[in-house]
UniProtKB/Swiss-Prot annotation:
Membrane-spanning ranges: 14-34
Domain of life: Bacteria
Keyword Cell membrane recorded: no
Organism: Prochlorococcus marinus (strain MIT 9215)
GO cellular component: plasma membrane-derived thylakoid membrane
Listed name of the protein: Protein PsbN
Taxonomic lineage of the native organism: Bacteria, Bacillati, Cyanobacteriota, Cyanophyceae, Synechococcales
């Protein structure tokens, strides 16, 4: 059992760091897709002339 004075497990620290990065990237993707700047985005398929 770990106490507060013992060093944290390195694998847990790496896992938490990777999880935080993935959550940040997911949040940024959702914000850029549905946030206030999304109105300026265009669909390249709609802009393409057949």
């Amino acid at each position: 059992m770990q106490t507060l004075s013992s060093a944290p497990d390195p694998a847990a620290s790496i896992a938490v760091t990777i999880l935080a990065i993935l959550l940040a990237l997911t949040g940024f993707g959702l914000w850029s897709a549905f946030g206030p700047k999304a109105k300026k985005l265009t669909d390249p398929w709609d802009d393409h002339d057949d």
